[in-house]
Amino acid sequence: MLACRNLTVRPRLGATALVHGASAHFGSGGLHALIGPSGCGKTTLLKGILDILPSEGEILLHGRPLVSRDALLREVSFAPQFSIAHGKLTVSESAECALRLYQVVDDVTVETRIVELLKLVGLAERGGTLVEKLSGGQLRRLGLALELSTDPTCLLCDEVTSGLDPRSEDQILAVLRALVAERGKTVVCVIHNLAKLSQFDTVTVVFEGAVIFQGALPAMQAHFVIVDALELYDRLSERSRKHWQERWAESELRLMQAEAEEPLPAAPQERLRPSALSQLGTLLKRRLRLMWRDRGYVALTLAITFGFPCLVVIFALGGLPQMKGLALDQVGGFLETLQARASYRQSAAETATLVSGLIIFQVILLCLMGSNNGAREIAGERGLFEKERMSGLRASAYAWSKLIYVALLGAGQGAWMTIFVKLLCQFPGEWGPQLVVLSAVGASMSVVCLGLSAVLQSPDKASLLSIYLVGFQLPLSGVVLALPPALVWTVRPFIATYWGWAGYLMAMTESRFYDAVVMLDKGWLSPPAGAVAVLGAHLAVGAALLFWGCQKKRWP
């Protein structure tokens, strides 16, 4: 059913090959074991066949050369070593999401298929259990259920029995045998426990990146001149890879397999994928459900959303009332007038520093919220996304779901910051422009950090880079520290804090707060509309990074 010829697989383009000219054939309706010492290239071989890793050579499906990756993935599913599912979803919810993301199904069919899938893998009694509460063996069985949601013809399993107790291992193997015997599936399973080889129809041996045997267990024992399969790895270590390759090339069994031709079935009917809009709805529903179930995430988000505005209020209440006393009425003689003006200028300078600082403080806090919103959103679940994309999830639907969620969250935090501070501190200025400006700051920084999360594989790297990005916002804005003239308009277009600060301040032109600030700095300030336009450009750049990063394959 599935075969490869002269397949060479590399961890990345231009790197040293990990699998060298491998040829293997996995017949239809069989349970096939893929074995070899640790690090020999078993998983790499599977990933090369699936195009997860760059490869050279020929892949055949039903005896036909593969014409596209999509044609392969319509019939072949990949079950990784560790189940990739959201821990905060229940078992039934995980299966439901898989069905709705990969197939066009109605509600009645979904319910029926969920029951069928969970019964098939022995999780019928665990439908309401959170994934994070499952044991290791149950997680592996859930992984099989999720892969079977697309009803594949062939299932490639990467060490799904590794690290399990004997009972759990037997349960997994029983599920795999049932898939072959009762449903006619073809299953290829990477396995380490050589004592279980008697349960497989064929055994494929990989040694130092080369396929050196394929056949039934008795034939393997005869080929390597061993009595027990447990002696295999000791025997392999006695000779070089070249020796075993030459021995297999000269084997009569190898020649018989090369001459055998599997009948070509009719081309499989193309599986209809749900529309991008349908997948988008499923993803948004899942994201909201995950958000409310993750108490730590909810607590942190609420803490910064409501706590940061309180910090602004604490700093504002002690200083802003002094502005109400500012006046410049000409009373008394000439000397008294000069003294009054000097006093006014001193008071205005102090207040200008306070006002400008409070505005930039709000903007910086919103940038920090944006970093928290977006930095780990994709990098933290990259493996899950890549697995779902392989099964049929559209990258565009995934990217749009993240963009909508993160942008709305950031915009909402900006709006709340505006409302809270203005109501409690009676901050002057027009409500509309100030609300839009701070909402734009929150949304743009959230999306920019989301874009970084999409192009970086590690969530830690994405978080660190986002923190650096926020950290440089204040000094490079030119609001607190004066920049050299040559740098002002070189860096300013990229600094969200400047545009948020300027747009917010320009909405206060009718107040003494604005007059106090411009007395100290008479430089050009962007009006709110201009600030929002630049912040919108920042958001567009972040969105471009997001969609580009999601289109690229980045398996962890």
Region locations from a protein language model:
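The feature captures the beta-strand-to-loop junction immediately N-terminal to the Walker
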Residues: I35-P37
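Helix-to-loop junction immediately C-terminal to a conserved catalytic motif
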Residues: L50
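Conserved ABC transporter NBD signature motif
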Residues: G57-V67, L72-R74
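Q-loop/switch helix immediately C-terminal to the Walker
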Residues: F82, G87-V104, R113
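Conserved ABC ATPase "signature" region
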Residues: E96, T109-R126
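Hydrophobic anchor residue at the start of the ABC signature
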Residues: L144, I172
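ABC ATPase C-loop
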Residues: E147-L148
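Membrane-spanning alpha-helical segments of multipass transporters and channels
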Residues: H223-I226, W292-P556
